[in-house]
Amino acid sequence: MGAKDITGRSTTQGFAQQHGGVSDVVVKTPFYQVSCCGPVSWTSGCHSLTESTCSRLFYILLHMGASAICCLLLSKTVVERVWGKAHGIQMPSVLCAHLFGNSDCPVLSGSGAVYRVCAGTATFHLLQAVLLVRLHSPTSPRAQLHNSFWSLKLLFLLGLCTAAFCIPDEHLFPAWHYIGICGGFTFILLQLVLITAFAQSWNKNWQTGAAQDCSWFLGVLLATLGFYSMAGVGAVLLFHHYTHPDGCLLNKMLLSLHLCFCGLLSLLSIAPCIRLRQPNSGLLQASIISCYIMYLTFSALSSRPPETIIFQGQNHTLCLPGQNKMEPQIPDASVAVFSASIMYACVLFACNEASYLAQLFGPLWIIKVYKYEFQKPSVCFCCPQTVEPEDGQGSRARPADQETPPAAQVQSQHLSYSYSGFHFAFFLASLYVMVTLTNWFSYEEAELEKTFTKGSWATFWVKVASCWACVLLYLGLLLAPLLAHHSESPPP
């Protein structure tokens, strides 16, 4: 089993000669022989997928597993039922005295456990991101760090998490808390960049087709109406479930404000002064952003603590679904679980899309992705097919090691996504999951049940701020070309 098992059998004699040298070198080195601990056995079932795609799936599964473990350790119900410990899982006293010299040891559950598991996963991805910087060829020996050594990497990840549990609370929380906050906010900004780039790419692509064919114009119209309909239905449902005539003033003000934002962005998208500098600007991208604003509003409202009022001498809970009636209600976790599922799906999408765009456009992809112009319309609008050469590496097209014919694989020597960018995105995602589960700034008494049923003001305002940041980012994209034109115009 050697490198030929990974790169595939050659279809021509020239291709065999081209890669024969690389295969011989890699097979003969101890570096690749050690990789037999993982790559062949783990990826042998992925005959219909490429190695890089299988690797990406395995890393996603690792991250999902770590996140699930964090949820279990944060759940007071699970800890009490499985271990019977009302105050958390304690480290054995003998091991505690040996490691710390006293009986004051970290609790192996709760927010401290979440911080330590996420510290291990974040360090795991950050180290790989550093080691894989400026990697451009899938045949490079460094690429095996990403695609191989699965058993060793799993043991290394477990070792990092175990080592994190040996760090006392007073040394872990102060520094790692601020690192987590910064990483979490950075990941939120990354998500906002991706959603605005997604909306702009879709609009540019289909507007290009609408200028040539009426069928594309019909597609633009239907998509725009569809997104505005979803945003409108979402707003109605939010007013119905998250407001009450006798309270919930903050929810009413927030929903009204965000609806005004949606209307303002829609008007600016079709304003003549904006379209003069951006001819492709239209309601399609504004409708996508409006729909996303409604989702962020829903996420924020479902994360706030309920409001309590006194009615006829009794306390009544309002401002959450199922709790707006003047009668005792049991908190419903279904909405919170639904919101958390969407959130984690967005996390995985952001990690994968960021790594692809980083490989396609280079380190400055956050800027270049907005400037890309489509030559012809296509249904697959979110993935540009070709870009200009970057740093003398030749034209970067969509690499052919993803479900492409063998003839295309012969010509492809590029990565299908940036390995370093992929791991750095998962580094930020690990920090984002950590601070989200532990209520951001109020992590001391975080519990899974409270996080998803009772909420916290810290999480609420973080999500509201992310919604406002999305509005400002899209507003900047609309106004930046106009402001730049006025600044460059000579005075009369």
From Swiss-Prot:
Compartmental location: Membrane
Superkingdom: Eukaryota
Residue ranges of coiled coil: none
Record-linked Pfam families: Serinc (PF03348)
Topological type in the membrane: Multi-pass membrane protein
Main subcellular location of this protein, as a coarse class: membrane
Record GO biological process: phospholipid biosynthetic process
Keyword tags: Lipid biosynthesis, Lipid metabolism, Membrane, Phospholipid biosynthesis, Phospholipid metabolism, Transmembrane, Transmembrane helix
Spans traversing the lipid bilayer: 58-78, 113-133, 148-168, 179-199, 217-237, 254-274, 281-301, 330-350, 421-441, 464-484
Assigned GO CC terms: membrane
Summary of the function given for this chain in its UniProt record: Incorporates a polar amino acid serine into membranes and facilitates the synthesis of two serine-derived lipids, phosphatidylserine and sphingolipids.
The family this protein is said to belong to: Belongs to the TDE1 family.
Protein known as: Serine incorporator 4
Record gene name: Serinc4
